């Protein structure tokens, strides 16, 4: 398993809405994540800066990245775009992080 981490950014005033939407994550989106090798997916929030820290373990990063091509992922992005910084294609603005330490 490969560990993948990134940072994303909420627009101010959307912390509760972000949590609400993820608490009700669409079953089709859950299925797509699992089908693309995602496991142990967590998202943490820095409440002072509206910064999100996402962590997911993936079987194969290349396969996981293909989720972006799915209709359900693009629909999810469109749904989330009004409450977080997003690219022109509605994907979240995300900064991939480099792992610098791991303790098994």
From Swiss-Prot:
GO cellular component: cytoplasm
MF annotations from Gene Ontology: L-rhamnose mutarotase activity
Entries under InterPro entries matching the protein: Dimeric_a/b-barrel (IPR011008), L-rhamnose_mutarotase (IPR013448), Rham/fucose_mutarotase (IPR008000)
Reaction it catalyzes: alpha-L-rhamnose = beta-L-rhamnose
Subcellular localization: Cytoplasm
Residues annotated as the enzyme's active site: 22 (proton donor)
Coiled-coil blocks: none
Stored Pfam families: rhaM
Subunit organization: Homodimer.
Family: Belongs to the rhamnose mutarotase family.
Protein name per Swiss-Prot or TrEMBL: L-rhamnose mutarotase
């Amino acid at each position: 398993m490969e560990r993948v981490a990134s940072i994303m950014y909420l627009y101010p005033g959307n912390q509760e809405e972000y949590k609400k939407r993820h608490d009700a994550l669409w079953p089709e989106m859950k299925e797509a994540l699992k089908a693309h090798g995602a496991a142990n997916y967590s998202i943490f929030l820095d409440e002072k800066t509206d910064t999100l820290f996402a962590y997911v373990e993936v079987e194969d990063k290349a396969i996981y990245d293909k989720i972006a091509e799915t209709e359900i992922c693009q629909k999810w992005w469109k749904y989330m775009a009004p409450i977080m910084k997003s690219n022109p294609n509605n994907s979240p603005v995300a900064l991939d992080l480099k792992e610098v330490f791991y303790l098994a």
